[in-house]
UniProtKB/Swiss-Prot annotation:
It comes from Danio rerio. Residues 486-511 have a biased composition (Polar residues). This is Ventricular zone-expressed PH domain-containing protein. Belongs to the MELT/VEPH family. Keywords: Cell membrane, Membrane. PANTHER family: VENTRICULAR ZONE-EXPRESSED PH DOMAIN-CONTAINING PROTEIN HOMOLOG 1 (PTHR21630:SF10), VEPH-A/MELTED (PTHR21630). Residues 696-799 form the PH domain. It is found in: Cell membrane.
Amino acid sequence: MHQLFRLVLGQRDLSRAGDLFSLDDSEIEDCLSQALEEIKVISCSPDYLTNDNDQAVVEICITRITTAIRETGSIERHGAALVSLWESCLEHNLQPQGKDEDTPHAKIASDITSCILQNYNRPPVMALAVPVAVRFLQQGNQELSRNMSSYLSLAAIAKAELLAQHTEAITCSVLAGNTMLLRVLPSVYPRQPEPIHQHVRELTAMMPRLDQTGRQHLLRLLQMISDLHPLVLSSLVPLLIGFLGDSDLGDSALGVLVNVAQSSPVSLAPFLSTLRNVGQKNPWLLGHIAKIHRAVGLTSEIQARGALQYLVSLLASMEHSAHHTLLLEIRCLTDRYTSILGGGGKDIYRMSNSFSAIARLLGRKLEADGAVSRGEEKVQDLPRPHEAESGSEMFAENLHLQVKIQAFEEKIGDEEVESEVDGASPGPQRRHSLGQAARDERREMRFNRSKSLALHAVRTRSINSDSSPEGEGLDLNAELNVCEAETSSVSSTPHNHTELTETQPDTSPNTEGAKVEDGDPRERDRLWIHLRDNMEEIKSFCAEMIKQIPVPEHCVIEDSHRGCVAKLSFSCPLKGHYCLYGKSSFSLCSSQPHLWIQIMLLALQSKESEALCCRDECVLQLRKLWEKTQLTGAHSFELAMTQTTVPHKKDVDSLQMYLEEVRFFDLFSYSEDKGGWLCFMCSNPEKATVVNQDGQPLIEGKLKEKQVRWKFIKRWKTRYFTLAGNQLLFRRGKSKDELDNNTIELSKVQSVKVVAKKRRDRGLPRAFEIFTDSKTYVLKAQDEKHAEEWLQCINVAVAQAKERENREATTYL
C-alpha cells in the first residue's frame, strides 16, 4: 500500500487525507484494492457510526480511490474489492435518519454505486455487481433505490441475462413502488417469464397510478406477454377492457386484447358490446375490434352470425381504405362456416372490388337465415290472433324489403357487369391509370349509395331474428329509428342532389325499382344517416360545448403562409345601448378551420328537430368552406363529418386555449339567462354607465414600460397610466401629478397581445404589448392579477372606441 494511504488509513489522520489528491493516479493504482480492504475494516468497526473523524477519512479516501479507478480504467482489476466493500454496507442500517440525512454506510454505498454501475457495458463487472445491486433495492432507502434502478435499466439493455435470475426481486421492488424498474421487466421477461406471470395481475392493476413513461413500459410488457403467452392474460380481460376509455392506453390495450382473443376468444365474448361502444366513440380502433369479433365468431356459428352482422355494419362507418381489412375478416368467418352463405362464398373473392355487391350478398343470406329461424319458432309456438296479425305485417314488410333489394340489384346490375369486365385483366396485377381511378371513384359512389339499403336489411334481421346471445351488440334504439324512418313521410321541400343524379342509370318510371328509389332519397345520404342516428349525443354535446366555446357568426377561409386559416367573426346578439359589437364584430384567425366547420355543423344540427342532409343550404355552405381547405387526398366533407360524432375533448380544449390567447374572454362571457355569449357591456349593464362616463378613469396605476426595442434586453421604466374615454394616458414620471403626458389613441390600437414569461409557461401573464399603426408598447404589471385587470380593461376600451367610431361613420353616411 502507498505510504500516504498507510498513514491516513492506519492512523485515521484526517489532516493528511487531503494530500491524497496531490498524488498521481499511476502512483496509487496498484494499491487501490488494499486500500479498499482497509476501508472495509474501518467501516465495520463497532464505533464507526459515532466516530466523525473516521467517517470523514473514509469518505475522502473513497472519493480518491473511485476517481483513480475511473481515470485509469482499472475497474475490472479492482472490481472485486470495490464490490466487497459495497456489499458490506448491506449489513448495516441504510434507512435515512431524518430528512435528507443518510446514514454513514448509505453514504459509502452511494459513492461506490456510481463508480461500479457506470460500467454497465462491462459483463465481468456486472456479473459481480448485479446480485449485490438487487439486494440494495430492498433496503428501504429511496434515493439508493432510485440510483440503482437507473443503472440497472442500462444494464438490462446491455446484458439482460445478468438480471434475468433476479426477476422475482425486481418485480417485487416494482410492486413496492419502485416504478422506475418497470423498464427492466420487458428485457428480462423472455428469459424468466414465470415470476412475472405470478404477479401480472398486480402489475396490471398499477396502470392507473403510473405516469406516462411507466404506462408505456408496462404496456410494452403486456404486449410481449400477449405475443408469447397470451393465455396468461385471459383472466385479466376485464381489467384491460377498463383501460379502453383512456385515450393514451386504448390503442395499446386493444392490441393486447387482439392477441388474447386469438388464443382465448371465449374470454372476450362477454365484452363484445362494450368493444362496439368503444369503436363507435373511437373509429380509429375499429380495425382491432373487427379482429376480435372475427376471433370470437370462429368459436361457433351463432357467434359467427353476430360477428358478421357487426362487420357488415362497419362497412357504412369506416372509410374506403379500411374495407379490404373488413372483407378479410368476413372472408375468414364465411370460410369456416360455409353454411351461412351457402355456395356464395366464392362470390366474395370474385367481387372483391364491388363492396356494394358484397354487402347486398351478405344481407340477403343473413336475411334468409333469419327468416328460417323465425319460421321454426312459429312452428314451435303458435301465435295468438294479435301476434298472427303482427307476424303478417312483418311478412309484408319483409316482402316489401325484398322488392326493394331486387329493384336495387336490377338498378346497379349494369354497373357491376362493367366492374367485373374491368376486373378480368389476365395478369395478376392491374395497371393503375386515370381510367382506373375514375372507375374506383364510381365504385365508391355506388357503395355509398347502396350501403344504407343493404345494411338496413342486415340490421332489421339482426333485431328480429335475435340469433345472437348479445343481440348483436348494436344500438337497438338507433336501429329501430332506422326502421321507423323507413316508413315515415319524407320532407316535402324540393331538393336537387347533383352527385347522386349523375351516377344513377336510367330506369323506366313504371318499374317497381324506380318507385322504391324515389321513396326517400335521404336514405342514401351518409351525413343525414349519421346525424339522425346521433342526434341526442350531438344535442347533449352542444349544450355543454356552447358554455365553453362560442359558435362563429361568420366564417371565411383565407390562404396564408401557414396554409388555410379560418377568419371567424363573433358579435353580441343583444345589441344593447352600450354594446361593444352593435355595428362591428370581434374577428380572429384560426389555423384549425376543419374543427370550426365541424362545430358549426353540430351547432346547426342541435337547433333542428330533424337531421340535416347534404342538400340543405346551410350544409352546402359549410361544404364549400371545407372544399376550400381541402388538400389533395384528404377526406370529403361527408366522410370527415361522420368519422367522429363529436370532437374530442382535447380539440375543444385547444380551441378554448386559443380563445384565451387572443383575449376573447376579456370581451365576451356566457350568459345562462340569454343562452349565448354577450359582450362585456351587455353582460354587465351596471358597469356600462360607469365605464361610459366622460373623463372618469376606467383603471389607473403604475405599469413598467420597456425602453428598448429588443425583448432580450430587460430595461424597464415605471410610468403612471390612466385609461379613460378613448385614450390611454401615461406620464414620464411615477406620479399622476406629472405634467408631461403621452397619449395612445385607443381607436388606433390594432391589437393587444400577451408576452409570456416562457413559451412553456401557461400561467397568467405579467407583460403585454399594445400595437398601434406606428409603434409598439411593451408594458408590465406588478403581478399577474393586475395584469389581467389591465388587459381586460384595455381590450374593453379598445372595442368600445372602435364601436363608437363605427357608429359615427354609420350616422354620417
